[in-house]
Amino acid sequence: MKAALLIDRGVLRVAGDPARHFLHNLVTANVETLTPGHARYAALLTPQGKIIADFFVVEAPADDGGGFFIDAPKALVPDLVQKLNFYKLRAKVTIEPLYALAVLAAWDGIGATEYGLDYRDPRLPALGQRVLLPPDVATEAAADLGAELVDASDYEAHRIALGVPRGGVDFIYGDVFPHDADLDKLGGVDFKKGCFIGQEVVSRVEHRGTARNRIVPVAFDAHAAEDGVAVTAGDKTVGTMGSSAGNIGLAMLRVDRVADAMAAGVPLLAGGIPMKLREGAIADFLKDPKA
C-alpha cells in the first residue's frame, strides 16, 4: 500500500443546519443522501453548465462539528469560498477555508487511521482512499494505514494509469462541460437528483448523447508528448494532450473526429509524435462516439 501527501489540495468547510440542502441545490452530486465519513465527487458549474471547480464533498462526523468538508484544488479554495458565499444569500451557513488541513491519498489497499478523517475515493475503487489531516502528521497517518509514504508524483502516475482526469491540468476550469471532463463516467453528476446550477445544459447533453469531447487514456512508444500540444489526425486537429507519466497520458479528444480517423486508418499524432489510444478505466465511450 502507498500513500502520498497531495500538496496541491486544500480543504474548506460548509456548516450550519441548512448546509446539506444548500450544497445539494448547488452542486452536481446528491448531497441529500450522503452519510458521515463518506464522500461524493461533484462540481460547481456556471449557469451555462461549465465547470467552475470539481471537488469531493465529505460529510463530517457529528463529533467533529458536523457539516461538510470540501476537498478541492488548493488554488481554487479562495474563489470557491467566495462563490459559495455569493450563493448562500440569507441561508444560515458558514463557509470557511481550513488552511490547517491537507489531503493524503492512499492506494493499493485499504486501511484506517486515527490521524484524520478518511474516506473512500468515490470515483473509482482503484483510487483507494483519502484522508483529511494536518500535514505534519502525514508520516504517522501513512504508518497507521500500513502504507509506504511516497512522492505525489507516484499518485499522479497511478491516476494517469487509471485514465482519471485532473482539473486544471487535463481540462481548464471555466472552459469545459462535465461530460468533456468525464464527470459523468466517474460518478460526478447525479442525473436523477433534480435541479442544480447548470443542470438544464448538462441534462440535455446526457439525454441527447451530444458530448463531443472526452478525456481518454493514450500511450506512446517512448516518452509521452508534452502537456498542451495539439493532437492531430492528418490535417485535422482532434484534441489536446494533457498530463502524462512515462509513456502514458491523457488527452482531450473530439470523439467523432477520432472515430472517423480510426475508421479511415489515419494515425493520431501528439505534437508530431505517434500516439495510440489505450485500454483504460473510462475509455469505453470511444467504442461509441455518442456515449
Regions found by a protein language model. Give the residues of each.
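Short glycine-/aliphatic-rich beta-strand segments at the starts of folded cytosolic domains
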Residues: 5-26, 94-108, 210-220
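Acidic, low-complexity central loop/insert segments
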Residues: 3-4, 10-11, 56-165, 233, ...
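Glycine-rich, small/acidic residue-mixed loop/short-helix segments
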Residues: 181-189, 203-291
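Short amphipathic alpha-helix segments
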Residues: 43-48, 104-115, 222-234
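Short, intrinsically disordered, mixed-charge
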Residues: 24, 28-32, 78, 82-90, ...
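Acidic, proline/glycine-enriched N-terminal capping motif
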Residues: 1-53, 61-65
